[in-house]
Amino acid sequence: YSCKKALYSTIPTIEQLKLSKQTLKSNDPKDSLLISFYVYDGDADLGVDRNSGSYDIYMDESRTIQNLRFYFPEINGAIPGAGKGIEGLCNVYITGKQLKIDSTVFPKSADTLYLKVYVVDKAGHKSNTLFTNPIYLK
């Protein structure tokens, strides 16, 4: 038997964060934007138990109004070659219903925010953090 070294760290890494567009109609469930990034994990332990109270993907707003939480899709069965790690493209759709203009201080018709994005694996390892370009709400 020989030991096979994982291609990636057991702490997840995310890279190449992109937005499909930068303007979103606030409170509109039909308008959406796509946030994409690559995720890498050396021990392939992505995907927390949905009953644990934890999530996989965290997107925290710069305005601290609302933080968004998501799960990775469930993968049934073993992942071939998972001992060497796992990598993949992650796509998350955000609707205008999820991001609203902050009018708590004074009424306004537009707003700007950033999202801080990171993932957490089953072992609780937090990935590096990436920030989106500005998202303009109208």
Regions found by a protein language model. Give the residues of each.
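First exposed extracellular module after export/assembly in secreted or surface-exposed proteins
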Residues: 12-138
